[in-house]
């Protein structure tokens, strides 16, 4: 730095012979000193700088330095300044302290002090200095274009500002014109940059608005799909050839109906490609299309029905009214046909026997009558009637079923017993030998194999209680059975039967077009249905829940709809679990929570995956129960829990 200072001295000597500048120059220099002192709030050495500046402000010596001072940020185009900047930028950080001491004998001592002071100021508050200097530049000289150029240079190289102080003392004042031209060009470039920034901001704001508007348009699109259906101008087409592509199906449907001189407004194919909806322009065309059911499209016979448009209140009333005149019949032989049931229920308006994949019935049926009085009469007359040696059980569906059949007895006990620990080889006949008063016996099976338990139904709670007292721990097919009351009633309650006695079914695999009304309509005896939808789009998530008045109705509906279809989609059924009846977490130890595999937390398990792992990683496992967490901590954190931070241990 001493060499550079000497170089500055030698280059400044030829300027001593130059004629003294006009007096205006000296005045402007003093004004600049005053303005520079005012522009910096943190410059402590202000009085020291002002006094020597006035003493040494001789025309020959101070003119180059003072002319260069405002050019500190604006005259960077000077060649000498760039070369000196490159040399100093490598050593400025290490030699900043030496620079102040080495420059004491130099005649331009006030200028050096200013450079050091400005270096300290630029490190502490570059942004404030930029703003203040930019504002002061307007009132300084007749050449204010130098300051904006300095601002641009400073914004690009803020960290290298101090390196420009001394080189500018060497820069001759004669190059001020070139600097002004460069500054004007920089002003134009800055204006262009500002315009481009404004354009970018407008584009970003516009794109953000478009993104916000996107979710709003989705529900509107969904509404238009159902508009035609609500007007009764849509048909439902089932049993489509799902092996074809969506476009193939649409083209085939369009060609099929156009040959029949029918005008199509829109075609919608379900995700499974097994069904679709076709909109027409008039009711007359819909009636013509309905007559085409059973015709082949792409090699399969299609089923054509009128698309349902539901009035929620009206549908609920119709459902309740129909349930009041519909009977639910259980314990019928698997070979029973509709004709055989028609012989027993002579006044029945409609009889439905749910069937499985193999076409055989599931031991239940629904019998609908013209009015509620006929249903009541049939219930009284046909209760316990025999079909092929089996005594049938008759009850109402829906809400009315609570008044008869499966209701609890006067003492609050259930009329249904659950038989646990049942031999897999046990049959209905072997159970009937033990439970002689049973009105219905059902052995749930999985792929033709018994599940190890059964349901025994009696005509009264008293009969069920007697069977519990006399038959519990009886041996059937070599195994001692264990009895309990269904629906959590009786001395033992709960158990497998209690957990299975849910009144709500969980339905998966629903079509995106299935509504809560169609879902409820699909299950005889249901009292309510709800479909889970996406909060943002309102679209169905493909699953829902169906509520029943009793657990027995839910079980019967599950059996009836097993492997069934709703709106062309095959659905999967299961009993819904009450909230809080979850098995997450386990009970620590070597079980589902803690242990060697960790589980999901547990209660004081032994960690898992070494010391803590998954078992203690959620604040309830590890070595110390709550907040344990082992070495890895997780949310519990370390040995003592703490605030949820992981703790490190050095090797």
From Swiss-Prot:
SMART domains: RRM. It comes from the Eukaryota. GO terms for molecular function: DNA binding; mRNA binding. Residues 1-11, 54-79 have a biased composition (Low complexity). Pfam families: RRM_1 (PF00076). Residues 1-230, 574-651 are annotated as: Disordered. One of its GO terms (biological process) is 3'-UTR-mediated mRNA stabilization. Residues 106-116 have a biased composition (Basic residues). Keywords: DNA-binding, Methylation, Nucleus, Phosphoprotein, Repeat, RNA-binding. Residues 585-644 have a biased composition (Gly residues). Signal peptide: none annotated. Its main location: nucleus. The modification Phosphoserine is found at residue 155. Residues 219-228 have a biased composition (Basic and acidic residues). Residues 233-309, 325-399, 415-488, 503-578 form the RRM domain. One of its GO terms (cellular component) is nucleolus. It is found in: Nucleus, Nucleolus. Residues 26-45, 89-101, 122-134, 155-168, 183-204 have a biased composition (Acidic residues). Nucleolin is the major nucleolar protein of growing eukaryotic cells. It is found associated with intranucleolar chromatin and pre-ribosomal particles. It induces chromatin decondensation by binding to histone H1. It is thought to play a role in pre-rRNA transcription and ribosome assembly. This is Nucleolin. It comes from Xenopus laevis (African clawed frog).
């Amino acid at each position: 730095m001493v060499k550079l200072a000497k170089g500055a001295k030698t280059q400044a000597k030829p300027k001593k012979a130059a004629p003294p500048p006009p007096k205006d120059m000296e005045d402007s220099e003093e004004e600049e000193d005053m303005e520079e002192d005012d522009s910096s709030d943190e410059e402590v050495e202000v009085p020291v700088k002002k006094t020597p500046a006035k003493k040494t402000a001789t025309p020959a010596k101070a003119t180059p330095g003072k002319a260069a001072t405002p050019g500190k940020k604006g005259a960077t185009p000077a060649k000498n300044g760039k070369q000196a900047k490159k040399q100093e930028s490598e050593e400025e950080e290490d030699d900043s302290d030496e620079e102040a001491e080495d420059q004491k004998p130099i005649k331009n001592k006030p200028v050096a002090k200013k450079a050091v002071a400005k270096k300290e100021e630029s490190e502490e508050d570059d942004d404030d200095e930029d703003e203040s200097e930019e504002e002061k530049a307007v009132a300084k000289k007749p050449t204010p274009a130098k300051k904006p150029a300095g601002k641009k240079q400073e914004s690009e190289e803020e960290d290298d500002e101090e390196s420009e102080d001394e080189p500018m003392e060497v820069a001759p004042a004669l190059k001020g014109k070139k600097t002004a031209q460069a500054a004007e060009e920089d002003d134009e470039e800055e204006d262009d940059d500002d315009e481009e920034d404004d354009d970018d901001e407008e584009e970003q704001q516009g794109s953000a608005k478009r993104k916000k508007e996107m979710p709003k348009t989705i529900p509107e699109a969904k509404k238009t799909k159902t508009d035609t259906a609500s007007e009764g101008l849509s048909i439902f087409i089932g049993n489509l050839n799902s092996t074809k592509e969506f476009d193939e199906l649409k083209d085939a449907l369009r060609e099929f109906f156009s040959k029949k001189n029918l005008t199509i407004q829109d075609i919608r194919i379900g995700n499974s490609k097994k069904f679709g909806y076709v909109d027409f322009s008039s009711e007359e065309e819909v009636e013509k299309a309905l007559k085409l059911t059973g015709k082949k499209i792409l090699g399969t016979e299609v089923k054509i029905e009128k698309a349902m448009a539901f009035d929620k209140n009206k549908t609920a009333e119709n459902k309740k009214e129909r349930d009041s005149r519909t009977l639910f019949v259980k314990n019928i032989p698997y070979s029973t046909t509709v004709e055989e049931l028609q012989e027993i229920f002579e006044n029945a308006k409609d009889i439905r026997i749910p069937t499985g994949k193999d076409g055989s019935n599931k031991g239940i049926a629904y019998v609908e009558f013209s009015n509620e009085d006929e249903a009541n009469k049939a219930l009284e007359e046909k209760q316990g009637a025999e079909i092929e040696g089996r005594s049938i059980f008759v009850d109402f569906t829906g809400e009315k079923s609570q008044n008869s059949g499966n209701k609890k007895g006067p003492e609050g006990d259930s009329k249904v017993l659950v038989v646990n620990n049942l031999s897999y080889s046990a049959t209905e006949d072997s159970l009937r030998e033990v439970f002689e008063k049973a009105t219905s016996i059902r052995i749930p099976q999985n792929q033709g194999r018994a599940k190890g338990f059964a349901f025994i139904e009696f005509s009264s709670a008293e009969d069920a209680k007697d069977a519990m007292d006399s038959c519990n721990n009886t041996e059937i097919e070599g195994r001692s059975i264990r009895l309990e009351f269904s629906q959590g009633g009786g001395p033992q309650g709960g158990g497998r039967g209690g957990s299975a006695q849910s009144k709500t079914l969980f339905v998966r695999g629903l079509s995106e077009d299935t509504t809560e009304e169609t879902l409820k309509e699909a299950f005889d005896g249901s009292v309510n249905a709800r479909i889970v939808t996406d909060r943002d789009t309102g679209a169905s998530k493909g699953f829902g829940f169906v509520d029943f008045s009793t657990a027995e109705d839910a079980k019967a509906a599950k059996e009836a709809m097993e492997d069934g279809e709703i709106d062309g989609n095959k659905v999967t059924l299961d009993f819904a679990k009450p909230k809080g009846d979850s098995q997450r977490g386990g009970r620590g130890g070597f079980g589902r929570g803690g242990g060697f595999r960790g589980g999901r937390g547990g209660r004081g398990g032994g960690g898992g995956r070494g010391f803590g792992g998954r078992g203690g990683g959620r604040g309830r496992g590890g070595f110390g129960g709550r907040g344990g967490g082992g070495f890895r901590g997780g949310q519990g954190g370390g040995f003592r829990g703490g605030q949820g931070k992981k703790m490190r241990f050095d090797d």
